[in-house]
Amino acid sequence: MEEKRQNRIGIITMYYNSSNYGGLLQAYALCKYLNDSGYPTKQITYDFYRKTISSSKDYKNLVSFLFKRLQKRTNNLIIKTINIIHGVSELRKDRRNICAEFRASIPHTETVYNDNSIEDCNNLFDIFIAGSDQVWNPDVFRPSFFLSFVNEEKKKISYAASIGNSITGKEMQSEYEDALNKFDRISVREKSDINKLEDLCKKRVEWVVDPVFLLTEKQWETVSSPVQLNINKEYIFCYFLGDDKRHREIAQKVAKMCNCAIVTIPYMQMNYRKCDSKFGDEKLLDLTPAQFLYLVKNAKGIFTDSFHATAFSIIFNKWFITFGRTDHPRMNERITSITSLYNCGDRCVLDYSDDVVQRIFDKCPLTTNCRYESQKALQLIGRSKEFLLSIGK
């Protein structure tokens, strides 16, 4: 009797050519968990940067499409000039190159697919997963992130997909409705996204954890890689995606109170920012995702506005403060969702009144012993694992 072949799983997320630490670490985690659970799993190397006219709805208005592209190129030229002046013109390429080894360590297709060739993946996989991360953000809408290329007889699942923004406009809502109704099962990372999607489609939407929580603290410790620091005292790690000067000022005050150095990764948007240029005792430009983990794990405390820096602060049981994004306030739902789940909502700062700032000072990293234990979180992790293990049945 011929032995039944195990279901092969293909994952589509923002993996290709990425230098985003959180994005790559969640991609690693989902592949790792599924492969360890007996499902042969790979990331689909999908070049989502190349948005063709035919694969977007922009072909309906070619003039508008070309104008937007010209406007973007003009803006990029201005930004590039500023970067050259301040010596960070090669930062994007450098970070992509230094993350290449970690990307390569994640099981993936050798072929790089685009919207015209991605249908070929139907020959490689039996089950397709969209997620995690912001694959369903309307600002980067791609039909392939909704598995539009997958044959009808194949299973279509989303795992911890995130919207990250509001789905506005009848045309966009209609596109989401059509795409979501073709899924076999849908799960999202933010609890607040459940009602948004269930209002659009006829499917049940489930809440699951980000893939990084599928692995244990010990597993992540084995992934981390040491960083050689040129400081001789304990440090606070600052990881800011936004450019709010107040976040950095508060971190500096706390570091001074605690006699800690500040270690930071500047220019996380790959462009020069004045708020980063004179901030921090040690600026690290060329780190791998594994070294990012090391900085979180060994810090005395963390200041951040990042979801995944918050997630790993929780995993490694570190003192942390997460600021809300003032430049993208709609993104704060993911932060409040995860801190609420782990009963540490007081670590999330969304306003900057005097009493809130004083509360941060009162919780000095050197005097705080953290342990984030939540029965609710453990139960959700368990349900998330059950969700994944059941997709092959």
Where are these regions (language model features)?
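Active-site anion-handling motifs in enzyme catalytic cores
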Residues: 1-393
